[in-house]
């Protein structure tokens, strides 16, 4: 079975390729803009191309049985059309919570007629890197909405679900909401980061206007969207869990384990 991974050197795409290799997939194709610098596992066939330029996907799609579709809204309809024309038998797409900004990906995949699996993760644990500069400067996190609650997921766990869906026969037609294994407040996340880093951390609650100024320097115009999300999670805490373990059978990554593995991002 031939598997094509688009966005293969992106954060999650690279993890999908690695997980497919670990699971013993023998015919993996990786689409990336710079094959010479891809540094992917031995045995992976690397194609030059980008899902943002659909014509470059054409050589890689021929003979493909299943495809991992990394998110790219501007060209998703054309990429799906090309996959259908090439006879791809199953698309596993990375979108987001149903009805959110990534919904057009699921709509395009379903419209093209190829059997599908939707991956719908919420927030990634890696979003904690928004605090990296603050942690390098000291032990205080300045942010708003300390009581916002959700269950962020490790990107590695999303990749494991993607690889499972790509290799499991007869499983299309599922939409998988994905979270981490525990619901945590922002304040609790900071406490766990401190445990991983070996020093106590403090969450200093800022008024929204001050937090907007802080995070506009980090995120630009996305800072408003970030704070809107925290406000929503304060009013409506996300406590329903959909851990990857329910699909893969492997333990889902806890926030503390993720923080210990990625402590270098904050030092």
Give the location of each predicted region.
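Cofactor-binding loops of NAD(P)H-dependent oxidoreductases
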Residues: 48-50
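Periplasmic-binding protein-like
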Residues: 68-70
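Oxidoreductase cofactor-interface core, primarily capturing Rossmann-like NAD(P)-dependent enzymes
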Residues: 2-42, 52-58, 62-65, 74-90, ...
